[in-house]
Amino acid sequence: MMAATAAAQVRAGTRWAPALCRMPWLPLMLVAAAAATSEQQVPLVLWSSDRGLWAPAADTHEGHITSDMQLSTYLDPALELGPRNVLLFLQDKLSIEDFTAYGGVFGNKQDSAFSNLENALDLAPSSLVLPAVDWYAISTLTTYLQEKLGASPLHVDLATLQELKLNASIPALLLIRLPYTASSGLMAPKEVLMGNDEVIGQVLSTLKSEDIPYTAALTAVRPSRVARDVAMVTGGLGRQLLQRTVVPPTMNVPVSYNDSYDTRILFWAQNFSVAYGEHWEDLTSRTFGVQDLNLTGSFWNDTVARLVLTYDSLFGTMVTFKFILANSYYSVSARHWFTLENLEIHSNGSVAYFNASQVTGPSIYSFHCEHVSSENEDGNLLVPDTQPSLWQMTFRDFQIQAFNVTDKKFSYASDCAGFFSPGIWMGLLTSLFMLFIFTYGLHMILSLKTMDRFDDHKGPTITLTQIV
């Protein structure tokens, strides 16, 4: 009997194989179905009785889909620092459009199908709403919570919850299933959502009466509505209808030397790097914004200023940088000009000198340059006295002012950019070429002359005798 059954199965398999070969479109259908499944998104609403668990989501604008990796970055702070009791309200179907269609989005709170949920979000110290979460991330959410909490999910209803004795120090994962229209017969979607909202309200009231801290999440297994095609707007390419918070770039705080009266010297750079031999060190974080920066030896008066920066452990020894500036009056321009005469590096009793006389400007201004470096490819504004030098220095967005500092701010900057830059030369040459063409054409027009003599056909004709 078993042999006959096996033989029948083998014969059936031989019949199915040619049939599958006659359907080459079947793999394409499977791939399309898998792609459609991967594009399904559902909302995720998180709230907790503890505060400060979530920062505002940076990419929850229109079209962004939260992946499983991004979701873990949102959940980890709540699971590691928040309450140990986690509630997961899981519906069969839910879409972000349900909140728009049945929620009190226009101020009509009495007609909202999510009154208890809205009240919980308003009162929660921490909350986070993710409009679109990838279906795969939601499908593995229960397993992820179980691994992070170290507790098996417990399927409960309202009656079971009232009998449970939860402890704030013992982790617990409570799973509450909520129905939707697919399992509610002839009930309208709004009525089902209102019933689910009542269940959420009763569960939260039970926890509140027992004074149990918790973290809750509301999501669904699959979306209730067919999502429109967002393939062209994922990853931040879509129109962002809501204003996004723009994080300003971090700016280094300038180094300031103050005497007993006021701020005298200001020094700033976006990047400050120094090299000894082939080894480079970035001193930006050790220089700007440092409260205990060693400025011992700095000096200032009306004609000479010296800014001294000392680092205790740089390349295994103490290294000191000295910026020496001079302020002089020039009768030709009838104003004072400052010059960074030298930049000195003191280390192990030796001194390396760099000529920086190109760092100059009117003393009422500061000096700014995109690159101030001892390397040739960056302009070579710092020229070492000895070649080759073991020391190399590079400043990016360099700015310094040692005279006429007011209100602890840089004055107007005299930039190192030359007037005859490549772009300016291109514009000048093009303009001169077009001017030459215009001048040549005008000269040709002015040189045109009309004939003042014409052939008179009434006069005697000219006869040419042919000589053979």
UniProtKB/Swiss-Prot annotation:
Residues 36-417 are lumenal. The keyword Ribonucleoprotein does not apply. Residues 439-468 are cytoplasmic. InterPro entries: Ac45_acc_su, VAS1/VOA1_TM, VAS1_LD. It is found in: Endoplasmic reticulum membrane; Endoplasmic reticulum-Golgi intermediate compartment membrane; Cytoplasmic vesicle, Secretory vesicle, Synaptic vesicle membrane; Cytoplasmic vesicle, Clathrin-coated vesicle membrane. Glycans are attached at N167, N258, N271, N294, N301, N348, N355, N404. Keywords: Cytoplasmic vesicle, Disulfide bond, Endoplasmic reticulum, Glycoprotein, Hydrogen ion transport, Ion transport, Membrane, Signal, Synapse, Transmembrane, Transmembrane helix, Transport. Disulfide bonds join C369-C416. Residues 1-35 form the signal peptide. GO terms for biological process: cellular response to increased oxygen levels; intracellular iron ion homeostasis; proton transmembrane transport; regulation of cellular pH. GO terms for cellular component: clathrin-coated vesicle membrane; endoplasmic reticulum membrane; endoplasmic reticulum-Golgi intermediate compartment membrane; proton-transporting V-type ATPase complex; synaptic vesicle membrane. The record marks R228, D229 as: Cleavage. It is a single-pass type I membrane protein. One of its GO terms (molecular function) is ATPase activator activity. Residues 36-228 form a propeptide. The chain crosses the membrane at residues 418-438. N-glycosylated. Belongs to the vacuolar ATPase subunit S1 family. Accessory subunit of the proton-transporting vacuolar (V)-ATPase protein pump, which is required for luminal acidification of secretory vesicles. Guides the V-type ATPase into specialized subcellular compartments, such as neuroendocrine regulated secretory vesicles or the ruffled border of the osteoclast, thereby regulating its activity. Involved in membrane trafficking and Ca(2+)-dependent membrane fusion. May play a role in the assembly of the V-type ATPase complex. Accessory component of the multisubunit proton-transporting vacuolar (V)-ATPase protein pump. Interacts (via N-terminus) with ATP6AP2 (via N-terminus). Interacts with RNASEK. Interacts with TMEM106B (via C-terminus). This is V-type proton ATPase subunit S1.
